[in-house]
Amino acid sequence: MALITTGRGMIRDLEKSGSLAVYPPLEGGFEGRYQRRLRASGYVSESITARGLGDLAMYLTGVHGVRPPHLGKKTVGNGPAVGYVYYVPPIVNYKLEHLPPKAKGLVLWIMEGQILSSQEIEYLTVLPKSEPRVKVIVEMGGDRFFRWTPLQNTLVPA
């Protein structure tokens, strides 16, 4: 890999396809450099991990209920003793509403994406088509150098 990389190729491919699968080196460091280049080109970056997301569509674009660990505390009354449900706003819609006026859009950077199912990856490829200001980057594993491919190419035909 070159010592000085502008990241223009990745940004151009991201704008063209809407979603990318990236394979950064396992020793780390490259993700932060490319996120910094995305922010310098006008995007707002949001990093999340794929572990524990649950229903991806509801977590990203719908109001969803969250029940935190009860730690011995139970609800009072006649309901089930499993704790209260707190409702959380959707991450993507909330971030889009609060984008700076000059921002190009929102880049959703998802770490540990190799655990996502093919249905969830397919949803992530459709998300930028339904909301053009959202771009998706999913880390799909490691490689010896930083490389990327359109996320659509990682889907295996059934």
UniProtKB/Swiss-Prot annotation:
Entries under Pfam families matching the protein: NdhN
Domain of life: Bacteria
Subcellular location: Cellular thylakoid membrane
EC numbers: 7.1.1.-
GO cellular component terms given for this protein: plasma membrane-derived thylakoid membrane
Keyword Nucleotide-binding among UniProt keywords: no
Reaction(s) this enzyme catalyzes, per UniProt: a plastoquinone + NADH + (n+1) H(+)(in) = a plastoquinol + NAD(+) + n H(+)(out); a plastoquinone + NADPH + (n+1) H(+)(in) = a plastoquinol + NADP(+) + n H(+)(out)
Principal location class: membrane
UniProt KW ATP-binding keyword: no
Membrane-protein topology: Peripheral membrane protein
Top EC class, one word: translocase
GO MF term (any one): quinone binding
General function of this protein: NDH-1 shuttles electrons from an unknown electron donor, via FMN and iron-sulfur (Fe-S) centers, to quinones in the respiratory and/or the photosynthetic chain. The immediate electron acceptor for the enzyme in this species is believed to be plastoquinone. Couples the redox reaction to proton translocation, and thus conserves the redox energy in a proton gradient. Cyanobacterial NDH-1 also plays a role in inorganic carbon-concentration.
Protein family (similarity comment): Belongs to the complex I NdhN subunit family.
Identification of the protein by name: NAD(P)H-quinone oxidoreductase subunit N
Phylogenetic classification of the source organism: Bacteria, Bacillati, Cyanobacteriota, Cyanophyceae, Oscillatoriophycideae
Gene that this sequence comes from: ndhN
